[in-house]
Regions:
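Alpha-helical transmembrane segments and terminal signal-anchor/GPI-anchor hydrophobic tails
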Residues: 34, 52-79, 182-313, 351, ...
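Start-transfer (signal-anchor) and selected internal transmembrane alpha helices
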Residues: 1-42
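Transmembrane-helix signature of polytopic, membrane-embedded enzymes
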Residues: 34, 105-124
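Membrane-interface transmembrane helices that cradle and orient dolichyl/undecaprenyl
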Residues: 142-160
């Protein structure tokens, strides 16, 4: 496979889709989403060939490992898929990310959100993260199931709640890190206002102090013996300077826009203009963001846990942006979306150069 050529295709698709949505979203004229079906096709292509991330090669190595030992080291659900497809890696990605995209499309439809705005913000802000990480399947399943909790079906309401519960807890089997979101989920049903937001911030500070001073010192000596403890080591997050710049360019727009949304929607109480179910997703976004910040300021040497939790935000974040479109300043949305778009291109360009010199990170 010609990896640099695939990266060029990634760049072309990401830019074409982003610009297709960006100009109408922030122009004077709205556009019907005549490219709706084609957009999903291109999103699937990005998921199949997301060579801009080292995870694409990591999962392929897991498949090779499975062929030798009938065990991939991934969650059992992926071993079940690998057992059926007999080592065809692209087919594996087609099944996993195809189901994830289908769940995502169904979620958008259930919430009755404008498809053009929803896809536009998801493409600009979230697709590059969604396309490379296997947690995307679990995230799609969790947020899809959660939609039955906040917007149950009119008929057979109990069945809807039950189905949503099954989906939410099944998501954990797709990626163990989703336990974090499941634990946060009950708190999303508590309305978020200024005093409560400050209370949550204080709770994060207290938890941070307890973790850093009372918990982490006692478990630190055992980390090297535990599965998955590469998340806690500084070496696991060793990055060249160029990658640090790319990471900053990708994350900075999110931090800026989150601060603005907290001011507009929490401090100025504009979230009241959201429907009840959208308010729940907004609280979810805030809780995920605060959790990621807590991990960032913890004494854990690696930032892997921080950014893994942070990147779980993009599905509900796109939902919130599409609904906040008529509530907050479009100029701020445009500026931050442009920054996110440029950050995405920096990421793709860095990966392209990495493929050319054989040092993809």
């Amino acid at each position: 496979m010609n990896y640099p050529f695939c990266i060029i295709l990634n760049i072309l698709i990401y830019n074409s889709l982003s610009l297709y949505y960006l100009f109408p979203l922030f122009g004077n004229k709205s556009r019907k989403d005549n490219g709706y079906v084609l957009t999903w096709f291109f999103l699937l292509f990005l998921c199949l060939y997301s060579l801009y991330s080292g995870d694409w090669f990591h999962y392929r190595e897991k498949l090779d490992f499975y062929e030798m030992y009938s065990f991939s080291g991934l969650e059992p659900v992926y071993d079940m898929i690998l057992f059926q497809i007999e080592g065809r890696y692209i087919l594996f990605r087609f099944i996993v990310w195809g189901i994830a995209l289908l769940l995502l499309r169904t979620l958008f439809h259930r919430l009755a959100i404008n498809s053009f705005r929803m896809l536009g913000f998801f493409v600009i802000w979230g697709i590059l993260f969604f396309a490379y990480a296997r947690v995307s399947l679990g995230l799609s399943l969790l947020f899809y199931g959660y939609s039955f909790w906040v917007k149950p079906t009119h008929k057979m309401r109990f069945i809807g709640y039950l189905w949503g519960t099954v989906c939410v807890f099944s998501s954990i089997f797709c990626h163990k890190s989703l336990v974090v979101l499941v634990l946060l989920l009950p708190f999303t049903f508590i309305s978020l206002y200024r005093k409560r937001f400050l209370f949550y911030c204080c709770c994060c500070i207290i938890l941070l102090f307890i973790f850093n001073n009372l918990i982490l010192p006692y478990i630190d000596i055992y980390l090297s013996q535990l599965d998955g403890t590469e998340y806690f080591s500084a070496e696991s997050y060793a990055r060249p300077f160029g990658k640090k710049i790319v990471d900053a360019s990708v994350r900075s727009p999110l931090f800026i826009l989150m601060a603005y949304l907290v001011y507009e929607l929490v401090w100025k109480k504009k979230q009241k203009e959201f429907s009840w179910e959208i308010q729940r997703y907004f609280v979810f976004v805030i809780l995920i963001f605060l959790t990621s910040l807590t991990l960032f300021f913890s004494d854990i040497k690696s930032q892997v846990l921080f950014y893994r939790v942070l990147y779980m935000i993009f599905i509900p974040f796109a939902i919130i942006l599409s609904e906040a479109y008529f509530i907050v300043s479009r100029r701020v949305l445009l500026l931050c979306s442009l920054m996110a778009y440029l950050g995405g291109n920096m990421w793709l360009a860095y990966s392209f150069l990495g493929h050319l010199n054989g040092t993809i990170q």
